[in-house]
Amino acid sequence: MEELQEYLKIEKSWQQDFLYPLFFQEYIYTLAHDHGLNRSILYESAENLGYDNKSSSLIVKRFIDRMYQQNHFIISSNSNSSNQKKFLGHNKNLDLKIISEGFAVIVEIPFSLRLVSSLEGKELVKSCNLRSIHSIFSFLEDKFSHLNYVSDILIPHPIHPEILVQAFRVWVQDVPSLHLLRFFLYEYRNWNSLITPKKSIYTFSKENQRFFLFLYNFYVYKYESMFVFLRKQSSHLRSTSFGALLERTHFYGKREHLVVLFRNDFQSTLCLVKDPFIHYVRYQAKSFLAARGTPLMMNKWKYYLVNFWQSYFYFWSQPGRIHINQLSNYSLDFLGYLSSVRLTFSVVRSQMLENSFLIDIAIKKFDTIVPIIPLLGSLAKAKFCNALGHPISKPVRTASSDFDIIDRFGRICKNLFHYHSGSSKKKSLYRIKYILRLSCARTLARKHKSTVRAFLKRLGSELFEEFFTEEEEVLSLIFPRASSPLRRLYRERVWYLDIIRISDLVNHD
């Protein structure tokens, strides 16, 4: 426990004891609402409510007082639905929205100062390529062929609001700020929806995503920092005797808390060793743990995580929900790709004097393909096709100009091809292009009250040029005529290092 406390210890210089007065500074709300510093939400609200622009601190004080006074409408047992509706509908929650926007900026200050302090005197190589989603797959391409097992992990949710408040006490010791945070967390009962990857975020979280994203990132930070601590400590634990003794050695005492390390009980059987074959990858709330080892070792990691969630976050999870799969027989559904490690066999002829030998060589190869069925489901949900994959028109687009319709459909097609350029089998992507192209033609024909055949005959190749991908445009200039080398080149996987977000059509989890 002492080692864990040292690991999480924060210096006093990083703790901000006086954040609450910043709530009464008008420039905080200017930064929160308008990054261009043209007009702040506080000025706009003051005009609507009849306040003077110069009295920003008084406005915020009245907002905070009114929030605490009106809170009894919700927590009182005698309140009726009309009172709740009155409070929740009060000027679209303007008071709470303004304060929470400023709160999102203020609570980031301790973390920013900590980051600046940790980077002092260090020269870091800035690389924007590491921000790309495709950089994850290039990492997996190098590492996965050497691993044996993978386990899908969903970050547990929901977490109790009081756990977040207690975690904030390590960073912020300003009591009024902690009370205000507790008020926000209990006021917005839908805040847990942000932790769920695909559940909708309700009105407030859409208006002030910065506040909720900060809470979620802080929650993930606490989860992953403890996970890294367990990873570092496990690298120090190994038996110097036989493998059977290793399996009988309990790495951590789980009777009370997972993080209590009984190093003195088996100090003679431990030595310092580093295991580089455990990898952890996360995007949003979905992550996975891959390792090279035995199923028993992966099972230990699984129970470590389950006990950690129970002891630290008070989240009760079932170990059976965390599945351990062998990479050779499993496809990992992650970031819109089905990733797997498959064996490719090749025959090598070896000649020794007068004798020749045929040697079969098995090579592990990282393979990525596009899951066509979920992608078709996303297109059907977006009304580009029906449930069977047949293209349909989009009536909502008929009010736009022909150029805007063609440009929008073309950009969607190019973005999908651009994101899935790392697929080793692009044949399924041509079906997606066919659906989008014919859906565009049906939309234009519906707008002009014509048939698709007549409309395609009138436009000719102009419609199809908008659906050319970047690779097709470049390769068509290099190779004017279709050739076998061109087709082989286009089938190769390409990872782009400029993709920093995932499309809603791709994110079908």
UniProtKB/Swiss-Prot annotation:
- Molecular function (GO) terms listed? RNA binding
Subcellular localization:
Plastid, Chloroplast
Pfam families reported in the protein's UniProt record: Intron_maturas2, MatK_N
Keyword list, A-Z: Chloroplast, mRNA processing, Plastid, RNA-binding, tRNA processing
The primary site where this protein sits is plastid
List, alphabetically, the GO terms of the cellular component aspect.
Answer: chloroplast
Domain of life, per UniProt, equals Eukaryota
Any one of the GO BP annotations: tRNA processing
Q: What HAMAP family has UniProt attached to this entry?
A: MatK (MF_01390)
Family listed: Belongs to the intron maturase 2 family. MatK subfamily.
What is known about what this protein does?
Usually encoded in the trnK tRNA gene intron. Probably assists in splicing its own and other chloroplast group II introns.
What is the protein named? Maturase K
- Which gene is transcribed and translated to give this protein? matK
